[in-house]
Amino acid sequence: VHYEIGLGDSGLTYEVGDSISIFPTNKKLLVNSIISRLGVEKDTVPAGFEDTIEILLTEKYEILTPSKRLIEYVADKSGDKVLKKLVDSEDKKAIEDYKWGMDVLDFMNINPNLKIDVSVFLGLCQSLQHRAYSISSSMNKHDKEVHLTVSSVRWKNDDRNYNGVCSTFLADDVESGGELKVF
């Protein structure tokens, strides 16, 4: 999909071959599913935080790609012998193969009875990072715009649909004329 991002009076400049970084937000469905799985309300403010769990999971934390800390925690606490053996082996490729296509919710659900405190959970997650995309335009022709060509990442695994964080943020969540956080 072709996107045109207006630079307005930002003063941002670019050259051929540069990239632009976009700060996405997480999908509402996944955010709500994790909040439900944690057993708290959307407006819960976890101990040690100023924002609600909904804001934290939407804007601040990576909930698509499970962190090493989360995987180790689940392996230790879930009672899943296969995952525990895999993590104990420290075989990075085998762990990558195991977690391929899985998100944070999938790991939380390895043992549906596993309770995770909200503050502990957030400590196991990584910060939501910007995503960089190659610019497909030239300032010589478009001095107030950045053009991007982005393919939306989507897949289905078992009964769930999965979405890339930023590619589908651009495709589904940013309205024409809407604002983005970029650098």
Language model feature labels by segment:
Residues 1-183:
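FNR-like FAD-binding dehydrogenase module
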